[in-house]
Amino acid sequence: MSVNMEELRHQVMINQFVLAAGCAADQAKQLLQAAHWQFETALSAFFQESNVPSAQHHPHMMCTPSNTPATPPNFPDALAMFSKLRTSESLQNSSSPAASNACSPPGNFNPYWASSPPNQQPVWLPPASPTTHLHHHHHHPQPVWPPNSQPTGGPQKAMAAMDGQR
């Protein structure tokens, strides 16, 4: 790999580490270099260090994980990252039409799974008007609950298996 590609790969890994761990880029770079650019190894080292209550490992800064279920994200850092995203997106939008579609649903997106159209009743109500009948001609597969269950006697097989265990 060329030197530029190697530098780019390292920079991407540093950015991913900052996002995953919520720490400063210089600390991410130090940990990644110490782990010979093994992302998981460096991440493990970071979280093990941050769980040690003493500050003797890093007396200048104690960088704890900020985006875990137990701790809220570090809002100044998050806001700074969002402002960087906004400026980079505005640059991309002028040259790349695909960037403007990034937040749009894909072309095969089916809005019926989330809500019913205003002129039709929801599918789960019994048909009470002719407009509901029109929905059945779209030939969308009807949702099956639970997922992956087949209408061919799945519950009976499960009951037979449970009866056999008793």
UniProtKB/Swiss-Prot annotation:
Residues 120-166 are annotated as: Disordered. InterPro entries: UBA-like_sf, UBA_8, UBALD1/2. The gene is ubald2. PANTHER family: UBA-LIKE DOMAIN-CONTAINING PROTEIN 2 (PTHR31993:SF6). Belongs to the UBALD family. It comes from Xenopus tropicalis (Western clawed frog). It comes from the Eukaryota. This is UBA-like domain-containing protein 2. SUPFAM superfamilies: UBA-like (SSF46934).
